[in-house]
Amino acid sequence: MKYGASSLAFVSLTAKAQRASPPLGWAESAVPAVSDRDTPPIAAATDAASHLTVAVRIDGKGPYHFVVDTGADRTILATEVADELGLFRGEKVMLEGVVRAVLTETVAIRTMSFGSITCRHRVVPTLSRTLLQADGYLGLDFLDGHRVTFDFKNHTLQVSEPRPRLSASWARENEARISASGSGGHLQALDCVVDGVAATAFIDSGAEVSAANAPLLAALARRNPSFGEMGTIRLIDITGGEIVGKVAMVNKIRFSGLTFNDCPLVIADFLVFGVWGLRQRPALLIGMNLLRQFARVSIDYGLKELRFDLAAYLPPPKPLITMAD
């Protein structure tokens, strides 16, 4: 059995797992999120790779510090935490990282609580805390169906109910709203254009860097013969696998209401593009190096929309982010 995984950083990449079957007789369930007014923002710590981490309780124990990863299909738990809690060991599964796949154990969790939300009867893969650099990763199995707001200005993170559909077309001043499509949490923005090349984009909050796939690189080279790589970089995923990626600079990444200028991208045959069904066409992974330029980023999995708040953005002499014309 194989489970997909992936995420990016300059010195390491982190893996994500797809669904593992629960023990016989278990049924997965979740306590619905309460309304926004009853869901206060949760103070978020920052790990070595500048990801936001939050406190999670497992079977009533903790708190444990988890990276919130919108590119991960499934939640992953550190082996050391599983040992500490004496969790039941399940079947072994093949966990497919960014670079390679490894055989890893699964454990059964009765309750996992984050803020006002509690998930019950989960089976999750495990990896060493040394590789994760955290106690675990919260994936789309936990986040899908909710609205996740990364408030970089106030250093908080909030998981709440989706916006009401009547408010879907409304946006605050200095807020860019982008519609997305997809299912199972795989929200993709289809109106992305990278230096004149149409591409599909998705947000991965577990990725320290932004990345492009080989089809996007090829399309950029065809459009601009002078386009080329600035160099190479070695990346390591959490399974211990290594890959050498190409580093390239693009002039503009444009969405319907937003433009990024002068963006460095890492380009390689990362497995995450295959997991998201984007291996054969130009695709872009938006990582933390771009997200952190905003005051706030919101991903609404119910309404299938992305919102970027520029209210507190202070541009350098040459802006990295501008509102599109």
Q: What are these model-predicted stretches?
A:
Residues 4-325:
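Pepsin/retropepsin-fold aspartyl endopeptidases
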